């Protein structure tokens, strides 16, 4: 048995999402790229490659990882490329997308004949949290002025639009896309490809897949463009758990269970977005606050109920631990970093990466 803590990726659950993605590809004509900023655990890329067209990135290292480990199309994007990295980025990508016109003007000559794009910020989004809203005031994410974009349109092959965030509502997606068309239609007609980014929760049960595919197909036909999608969370939703063990039990107005993991170090977005972790099979008469083991007072996974009183050594599965977890894990407090394990279709589990004190030491100097 693998020692806790560890991330457990269920390949059967991952396959369910990938089959939805493949259905969207086939029915809409869109190409689908994995957003490495969300999930970059390359030990399952052999499965994902069969259902996706490539990767999209936010940095030089992600570009290289996508090119070397995933294959297919490799799209390079960054909020700001640096002089010392641009040539290496170009060497590992198939398309390069610039965040601003100034970046485009500075570096487009380095890209040679490779397709070039620009991030288009339509100024509207569905983000409910200001921290993640690309349309927030004074946003640095992309260009909004149609006239400025048209000034370089003859040098552009495509644009990337990323203004959805955990959007589970097709009608909201449709409305946002319509706003983009109304303001930027002249630009769209002069491109060969358009990426609609990520944040579209089309693998969520009950999502209007039929309407979604038809909308993508119609958009592609209207503007004669290849549509790209860049799912991250939608790819790995409900595929991964963080397996932890209870290491202490206490009471301070409520029952407290301290586990051998941490939100700050292992599921950081719970803190950033003030969310509560879903606890698997958490129902019963015995309520506990599930606490992380760092010194941070607010290192709390959430509340859960259990059929029996918890004991030291009991294992707990914390759900939805695939997106923005392994790519953000850190060594805060020197807490043991979770291993990464894979559950195969036959139910067998194998560890693919384990971390040690040597990894902690080598991450510092």
From Swiss-Prot:
Keywords: Cytoplasm, Decarboxylase, Lyase, Polyamine biosynthesis, Pyridoxal phosphate, Spermidine biosynthesis. Its EC number is 4.1.1.96. InterPro entries: Ala_racemase/Decarboxylase_C (IPR009006), De-COase2_C (IPR022643), Nsp_de-COase (IPR005730), PLP-binding_barrel (IPR029066). Transmembrane segments: none annotated. GO terms for cellular component: cytoplasm. GO terms for molecular function: carboxy-lyase activity; diaminopimelate decarboxylase activity; protein homodimerization activity; pyridoxal phosphate binding. The modification N6-(pyridoxal phosphate)lysine is found at residue 37. Its main location: cytoplasm. It catalyses: carboxynorspermidine + H(+) = norspermidine + CO2; carboxyspermidine + H(+) = spermidine + CO2. Substrate binds at residues 233, 269. Its cofactor is pyridoxal 5'-phosphate. Induction: By arsenic. Catalyzes the decarboxylation of carboxynorspermidine and carboxyspermidine. Homodimer. Belongs to the Orn/Lys/Arg decarboxylase class-II family. NspC subfamily. This is Carboxynorspermidine/carboxyspermidine decarboxylase. It comes from Herminiimonas arsenicoxydans. The lineage of its organism: Bacteria, Pseudomonadati, Pseudomonadota, Betaproteobacteria, Burkholderiales. The gene is nspC.
